[in-house]
Amino acid sequence: MPIYCHYNQIVATIVTFNPQFEILEKNILAIYSQVSNIIIVDNGSANIRLFQQQLKTYTKLYWILNTENIGIAAALNQAVLYADSIKAEWLLTLDQDSVVPDNLIRTYQQYIEDDSIGLLCCPIFDRNVGLLSKSPIVEETEEVEECITSASMLRISAWHKVGGFFEDLFIDGVDIDFCYLIRKHGFRILRINSIQLLHELGHSQAITILGKKLFLFHHPPIRCYYMTRNTLYLGIRHKCFCHFALITIKRSFLMVGFESDKLKKLLAIFYGIRDALLLRKLGKAPNLKIFKSKSR
């Protein structure tokens, strides 16, 4: 018989940036009864004060309103610090457009008494392309090397040991970096395969090349910049450059070869390579004309 964590020891956070109200409320409703508190960390959205007023009947919500976009890593660190201040032991991290199953926390609770686990996660079911997995899912649980932030639940004591999320990345690769740190400090990442997160990564699309299924995400050029820069930098930071360089080459081939805005994305990739390898420049993206488009 599993020993369940006390209800007040698990809280959730949703990091927002110009969210759509209906989707955000649906996300809140999906997790509302499963946790004791929900921390909304907003990164300078123009509409957030209105949303805060519209959601005032949800008494479990705690708002952290940043005046500008400080990046996903800094926002997550704010959430963990607040969760820690109210004596929570675990924090569920969510994107603004992800809808969790109603048994997510109940399922995760079966595994949190294992002190070796620093992160719990579940498979991702993309609305457009289906299940995102590098290999067939067979076992009920599986130890994995990495997972995305959304629907992962972190042990707050593990967050303290690794030093938190790396804020210089700003966005993209923040979750991968944290996973590397978690494992370096001796914690395990356990994926629970009996549940799934309904999610949407960009404007995802599946294609087949030489019999192999590959995914396009149609991110805007600024995200291509962050993905390129941060992926290469992580290779340097974690001393496995060849691995991350191959990921960058494959991703760049797909973005430039099969997506729209090819020239802008090619330039974004170039600037990402420059800033990662030559300038070693992180933080917020430079103010370039190719980035003057709507982005998440």
Feature map (PLM): residue ranges:
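Glycine-rich, basic loop-to-helix element that forms the pyrophosphate-binding segment
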Residues: 67-83
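Short, well-formed alpha-helical segments that are part of the catalytic scaffolds
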Residues: 13-33
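Conserved donor NDP-sugar-binding/catalytic core segment of glycosyltransferases
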Residues: 102-134
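Non-catalytic, C-terminal membrane-associated alpha-helical segments of glycosyltransferases
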Residues: 236-296
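Short beta-strand-to-loop acidic/aromatic patch adjacent to the donor-nucleotide binding site
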Residues: 88-97
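A recurrent flexible, glycine/aromatic-enriched loop bordering the glycosyltransferase active site
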Residues: 138-154
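A short, conserved alpha-helix in the catalytic core of glycosyltransferases
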Residues: 158, 162-163, 168-201
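A conserved acidic beta->alpha catalytic loop
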Residues: 42-51, 68, 98-99
